[in-house]
Structure formats: structure tokens, C-alpha cells
């Protein structure tokens, strides 16, 4: 660790059990992928994710890719809800040490303001019923069977409207917001403000994801983000990358989806303790410049 706990930002390269390292506060990785997403490891099964989370001390992990039919089928068969918490555990697991939260990343490509827009959005579902209803709608109108992270010809505000029409506690927020090609603030196809991206649905956006190429200190420089909850997650495409970025929350002994949702929605800084950060300098999009001229700013 190169920075003290009081700065609420961790930077690390080598780690073993984060739960022990962080004095047993809950580590949440809210953005990962399955073996069905493009360029992702075939080892990303629910059983392997559970085991890796136990090894690393990750308490709550995203399922990723719940819109992909084969993966959703695995989720339904291999996971079971813990009470009525909206969190899930592996059926064959010995205990509830690792809890799964239903999530997916959607790639939205559409036109707005006379420009082509490409934005990746995180969607977290409150339960299987809500996720299934969203899947059924998307399967009727879009192709969700070609990739774990499907491409939809839908706008950001329309997605928010759709999710909230199914269940009011869907959590929708922009992923890796600075990525140039597929992000809310992307230089190639993004927007200049949160409001420009989400229009009349902006009031329902409660968070944003930093992405690997930026850290909290960089994002805190933009005042329009001040009212939103900053989240950092791994976007893992393989097991070793789980929790390379993550969030550390102070949760109850028996956490629920609703507890996590409310903490993020209200930006409860008493419960959001800090994030675990990858070195942003190693992110693909950290520096500006011109590769052909060997110039980096």
C-alpha cells in the first residue's frame, strides 16, 4: 500500500486476502464479466469466481452478463437467494462468505445531438425476477445472444426508463466514464455532462465508475460529479483480475441488495469507506498524446 487509509484510496499491485487486509470490512467488486463475454477467460464460471473471491477476501461480487441467456440459465441453476436479500450464493458453497449481486454491462450505440454515441452502462438488478423481465424485453427487441456484453440500439435515458418501469430499485450508472470510445465522457463518442447523456432521467443516476485509467483524485476534480457516488470495480475479464479495483463498504452482518442500493443512492460516506485502485498510469487511456510522434502529455 502506497497511501494511508485516511486518504480512502488504495493502490496496489500484489495482494492476497483483501478481507484480512482491510480488517474484514466488505469488499465489493460490482463489475466483472463471464466466460460468455468477448475476450474473456473460459475459466470465468460461477464456481471459479466463488473460489477466487474466497481466496482474495471479496465479500460481494457481480455476476456480470446476466442478459446473456446461457449465463442467466447458469445463474438460475447454480445460485440461490440468501433469504429474500436480493443477494445470492453458490448452492454448493459451504457458507455465505461470497455473495453474488446481479449485474450486467450494456453497450449502447445510438445517435443523439447529431452525433453517434457509444456508451457502456452498468445495470444492477434487485432480484432474479426483475432481471428475467428485463432479459425478456431485450430478447424480443435486440440481439442479446451474440455476446455477454450485448450491443443495443437504445439511448441511455431509454434504458433507465425501461429498467425503472420493471422495478424502481434497478441501479443504473455509467461504466468507466473516461474511456474514449465507449463511455459517458469519452472523447470519441461521449458527452460533456451527465445531463447531456441521461436527459430527463438524470435524477435517477446515483453513481459512476472510474475505470482503470483514472483514480478518485482525478475524478474529484470535476465538480459536476460531486453529488454522485464514486465506484471502482475490476471489469475483470479473467479470474486473477477480480478486485484489481473494488469498493470497501461497512455493511451489516446480513447485507442485502437494498442496503447496498441505498448506500450508493444516498452517497452514505459513513458506509462507503474507500476504494481499491489499480495504478491509473497503467491504464490503457491514462495519458494523452500522439503515439506516432512518440509524444505523451
Language model features with spans:
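Short, positively charged and aromatic/hydrophobic N-terminal segments
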Residues: 11-20
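Extended substrate/RNA-proximal surfaces in nucleic-acid metabolism proteins
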Residues: 25, 73-206
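Histidine-centered divalent metal-coordination motifs
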Residues: 31-35, 67, 176, 237
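Histidine/acidic-residue-rich catalytic or RNA/ligand-binding cores of hydrolases
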Residues: 38-40, 72-76, 182-189, 220-221, ...
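Divalent metal-dependent hydrolysis catalytic cores, especially in the metallo-beta-lactamase
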Residues: 51-71, 171-173, 207
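Short acidic/histidine-rich active-site segments
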Residues: 228-243
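Cys/His-rich short segments
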Residues: 272-297
